[in-house]
């Protein structure tokens, strides 16, 4: 997919770079796979802000994407069209099964309209096909990897994402993630062959603040620009630094401080992710 740099007709368009994909469907999405998505603006049921910097943005429907792909084993399908999805960085593909049912799946790299798709242990090792890890050759590049069998894909789902199947040992397989972490997963978990498409997504440039507001992203204010009542870094006469170890608004150390508390799955991590 080519990158398009806009002409500098305004300051906002001077540095804007878009990802252009002429193969995307230009009509409306598949109506029966849409659900209403109500804007929460980062608030919970009490109205309290639980996620900062969210609010506004364009209205859009949620596309029901099939991340499990475990109930159509052995039924051939083909790609009807590729579509834009405002809810994720990757594009999605509408596939039509031989029994007449349509599903949305994440579009794999190189996926084209009319391509044959298959799910199940008997599916060929081809980009876009979904298989149990026990049936995938060691060394294969995979994406949309399950952590628990039947729960649906949780790993390597964003644009350009992928993982590598390193080994199989008994009922577990070792998978190397893009972060460098090597993790054990059950061989009954499923994964999709290939990489996630729209890999140029990371090369786009927003160009102006308003483009982020369209996406529902509000401004991020620095702590040193706040008052002491609002942030531990706030206050001072004139421009000042933090004056202490950098912390979050609630006093938790930041900039590299580890906050992982999920000890239950620590034994599944063979190698921690690499430092950046």
Swiss-Prot record:
Positions of region (Disordered): 224-258
UniProt xrefs under SUPFAM superfamilies: Nucleic acid-binding proteins (SSF50249), Translation proteins SH3-like domain (SSF50104)
Pfam families referenced in this protein's UniProt entry, alphabetically: Ribosomal_L2 (PF00181), Ribosomal_L2_C (PF03947)
Biased composition (Basic and acidic residues): 230-242
GO molecular function: rRNA binding; structural constituent of ribosome; transferase activity
Protein's GO biological process: cytoplasmic translation
InterPro entries for this protein: NA-bd_OB-fold, Rib_uL2_dom2, Ribosomal_uL2, Ribosomal_uL2_bac/org-type, Ribosomal_uL2_C, Ribosomal_uL2_CS, Ribosomal_uL2_dom3, Ribosomal_uL2_RNA-bd_dom
Keywords: Ribonucleoprotein, Ribosomal protein, RNA-binding, rRNA-binding
Assembly with partners or alone: Part of the 50S ribosomal subunit. Forms a bridge to the 30S subunit in the 70S ribosome.
Family: Belongs to the universal ribosomal protein uL2 family.
Protein's job: One of the primary rRNA binding proteins. Required for association of the 30S and 50S subunits to form the 70S ribosome, for tRNA binding and peptide bond formation. It has been suggested to have peptidyltransferase activity; this is somewhat controversial. Makes several contacts with the 16S rRNA in the 70S ribosome.
NCBIfam families per record: rplB_bact (TIGR01171)
Protein name, UniProt field: Large ribosomal subunit protein uL2
Record organism: Polynucleobacter necessarius subsp. necessarius (strain STIR1)
Annotated gene: rplB
């Amino acid at each position: 997919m080519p990158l398009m740099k806009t002409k500098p007709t305004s300051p906002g368009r001077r540095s804007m770079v878009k990802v252009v994909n002429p193969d995307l469907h230009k009509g409306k999405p598949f109506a029966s796979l849409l659900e209403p998505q109500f804007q929460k603006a980062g608030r919970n049921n009490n109205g309290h802000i639980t996620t900062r910097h969210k609010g506004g943005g364009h209205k859009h429907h949620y596309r029901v994407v099939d991340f499990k792909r475990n109930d159509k084993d052995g039924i051939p399908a083909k790609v009807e069209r590729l579509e834009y999805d405002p809810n994720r960085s990757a594009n999605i593909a509408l596939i039509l099964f031989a029994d007449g049912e349509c599903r949305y799946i994440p579009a794999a790299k190189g996926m084209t309209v009319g391509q044959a798709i298959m799910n199940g242990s008997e599916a060929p090792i081809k980009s876009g096909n979904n298989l149990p890890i026990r049936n995938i050759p060691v060394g294969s590049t995979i994406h949309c990897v399950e952590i628990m069998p039947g729960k649906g894909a949780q790993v390597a789902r964003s644009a350009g994402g992928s993982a590598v199947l390193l080994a199989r040992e008994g009922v577990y397989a070792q998978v190397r993630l893009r972060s460098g972490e090597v993790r054990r997963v059950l061989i009954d978990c499923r994964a999709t062959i290939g990489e996630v498409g729209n890999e140029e997504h990371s090369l786009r440039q927003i160009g102006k603040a308003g483009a982020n507001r369209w996406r529902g992203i509000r401004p991020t204010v620095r702590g040193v620009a706040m008052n002491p009542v609002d942030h531990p870094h706030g206050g001072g006469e004139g421009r000042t630094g933090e004056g202490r170890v950098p912390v979050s608004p609630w006093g938790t150390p930041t900039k590299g401080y580890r906050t992982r508390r999920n000890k239950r799955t620590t034994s599944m991590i063979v190698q921690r992710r690499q430092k950046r």
